[in-house]
Amino acid sequence: MILVTGGAGYIGSHSVVELYKKGHRVLIADNFSNSSPLVIGKLKTITGQEPDFIEVDLCDYNKLKTLTENYDISGVIHFAAYKSVGESVNAPLNYYENNIQSLINVLKLCKERKIDNFVFSSSCTVYGNPEIIPVTEQSKIGKAESPYGKTKIISEEILLDFYKANPISICNLRYFNPIGAHQSGLIGDYPDGKPNNLLPFVTQVAAGLREKLSVFGDDYNTKDGTCLRDYIHVIDLAKAHVNAIDYSSKNKGKYSVFNLGTGQGVSVLELLNTFEAVNNIRVNYEISPRRTGDVEAIYADCSKAEKELNWVAELNLAEMLSSAWKFQQKIVT
């Protein structure tokens, strides 16, 4: 059985679907800080299976230990974390406390229960503002532009130290900008309150739920002055996690790092224009000042994941944007 922390969240829920497809049994652990309890029922609708689920704050180790003791856990995929760059700038202590303590507790559980297969949800934020793009797994770990990014750097250091003392199989996945939704329209990126990421803001403006989108900065050194990102369909990303848990189980005692993206840089304005064209709808936006913590440009070299995980992103930007709009329309209706 695979323990999926944050399994009701955006990336976690899609990964649960893909794990079921590959025949894995899944235990979801979540406290719904970034998600909704309704997701559990939607996962049942999509997969046809009743997910095993525990509601727990991972910062409470005793409760985590108690609630998992009756499950035969062979591997962990650790998604659970606060994830907003902007929010982390305003509430850094919350991010350090939650993101670091939850990781420590899950690793303690692995050590105590002798769980030797661990996949970690890291981020391209660890590269900071890279000097050379595309970034490879060998690229320099940069100066994080936000407390959120710093929690990922610290988490990676904790993982490596833990591995040196307890040589279990660890896959550290540095992924780029996941967007899109499940083809059913039942699960997707549904932020609680004001969106922190670009695409949910775009879809909410398109749906008439918000007046306009703020594009933060048009004076960056990029092709159109707006930030450049590597957007990846959440389903492709979910499939990579399944490959990673299988890879980890076959490569005992190995510590691995993988970039997960498409390898293509897309600007904010390119994304907006493509969204409008694909979905035949206009999005009202305005140019605003730069936002603290934003990196100018980053995209991935994913050749290592292709070679070792036998994984490559398959879904294109148009498919990402059309699926996200389908999900938003289902929410509205």
Regions found by a protein language model. Name each.
Residues 180-182, 219-220:
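Short, basic/glycine-rich phosphate-binding loops at helix/coil junctions
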